[in-house]
């Protein structure tokens, strides 16, 4: 079974206890709200444009810039030097680390961005975790809800793993890069330093790190990065 340590470098972050206490890395998704309710102390240290909306129960650390037209619901915690760009929509239950970008027309809910993670343009990040240094190409969508509305079942090594979650987007390990208009199906666990090529739809499953994932017709092909 993949562990949080296989995917993320969370040492020294204030979320470390939550990751360490999770038997399975996706279990963190069900704990974000309670964690924020326990630890978040609302305060605005950064800069908020007059046309942006920042609701109560939000913490913005030093150097955070919220651009025109952005909308941030609580509970949300945003770390030092991060940017919430024009037209971004953060729907609460979100932790954004230091030096991150929530970009133009990007929607985020019940998610974690570890330090340096970027979703710069037209992305959807729902019920997902982005590891350190992850970069989502424009138009990347991390789908989080099955059409049949049942629990997300992970398919890995011939096993069916019931995650217990009706909504589960993707866990993208440290350094994952996605190409423009790529999509992950509900319940994707992608190991560190993978590349997902543009226009690729990645099926539900667990993928080892240091691979290239690309579509060939309706099939997904993976190969080791050189």
Show the residue positions of the predicted features.
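Terminal amphipathic alpha-helical/low-complexity segments used for targeting or macromolecular assembly
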Residues: 1-51, 193, 208-226
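Long amphipathic N-terminal alpha/beta scaffold segment
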Residues: 31-77
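N-terminal short leaders/motifs
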Residues: 3-23, 57, 69, 75, ...
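Short loop/turn microsegments at loop-to-beta-strand junctions
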Residues: 55-56, 61, 73-74, 92, ...
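ABC ATPase A-loop
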Residues: 59, 77, 95, 171, ...
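Extended, compositionally simple hydrophobic/Ser/Thr-rich segments
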Residues: 66-68, 72-77, 82-112, 116-121, ...
